[in-house]
A protein has these predicted regions:
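Mature, function-bearing regions of proteins
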Residues: 1-175
Length: 175
C-alpha cells in the first residue's frame, strides 16, 4: 500500500473493500503505526518538526495493509515532502514480532532525491535472535514512482550479515 496520509479517508470512501481504522477485506489502521495513538499524520509531523525538518508538505506511507484484519509490517516507510515537492526526509519504522517499533528519521540529500537514496544508521531495536542490536542498517531506496524498491543491508563489525529487499510496480487500488 502506498498512500498519502492526508488522503486516507478519501480513499476509503472511494473503495468498497478498503477501510480506515475499521475491519474490511483490506484496511489501514493508524494504531498499527507510529505511537499507536491514532493521529498518524500529526505524529509524523511532530516527529519531523522536533528533528528540525520543515514538515509542511505531503507525507506518504508505504506499508502492508491489513488483510481480513491481520497485518505484520516489519518495515513501514514514510516519504516526507516539503510544499515545493522536495523529498526532505524518510522515516523508516521497523517493527518486530513482539509488537515493538522503532523509527529511524533520516534526511534526504537534494542530490540523492532522483535516486537511489542511500541512508545509514545504527540499529536500535531488537528484531531477531540471530542479529544483535549492535549492528548498522544501510537503506537503499528508489523514490516512489511507477516502480518501488527498497533494500536493507545489516552489518556487524565484521561485515554484512543480512540483506532484505522489496521490489514492486505501482498498481491502482480499485474495486
Amino acid at each position: 500500500l502506498f498512500i498519502e496520509l492526508d488522503a486516507l479517508e478519501v480513499c476509503a470512501k472511494a473503495l468498497r473493500f478498503f477501510s480506515i481504522n475499521r475491519f474490511n477485506v483490506l484496511s489501514f489502521h493508524e494504531r498499527d503505526h507510529g505511537d499507536g495513538a491514532g493521529d498518524l499524520n500529526g505524529w509524523v509531523r511532530t516527529h519531523l518538526k522536533r528533528a528540525g525538518f520543515v514538515a509542511d508538505g505531503p507525507i506518504f506511507i508505504q506499508c502492508y495493509p491489513r488483510l481480513w484484519g491481520y497485518v505484520f509490517n516489519p518495515l513501514s516507510v514514510y516519504y516526507c515532502y516539503t510544499n515545493d515537492g522536495t523529498l526532505e526526509a524518510i522515516l523508516h519504522e521497523v517493527s518486530n514480532t513482539f509488537g515493538d517499533r522503532h523509527t529511524y528519521l533520516l534526511p534526504v540529500s537534494p542530490a540523492a532525491e532522483a535516486g537511489p537514496i542511500h541512508q545509514s544508521c545504527a540499529k536500535k531495536l531488537f528484531v531477531s535472535p540471530f542479529n544483535p542490536v549492535d549492528h548498522r542498517y544501510d537503506f537503499k531506496v528508489h523514490p516512489p514512482g511507477e516502480r518501488y524498491a527498497i533494500g536493507i543491508r545489516e552489518f556487524d563489525c565484521e561485515g554484512e550479515v543480512l540483506v532484505a529487499t522489496f521490489d514492486g510496480h505501482r498498481q491502482v487500488l480499485s474495486n
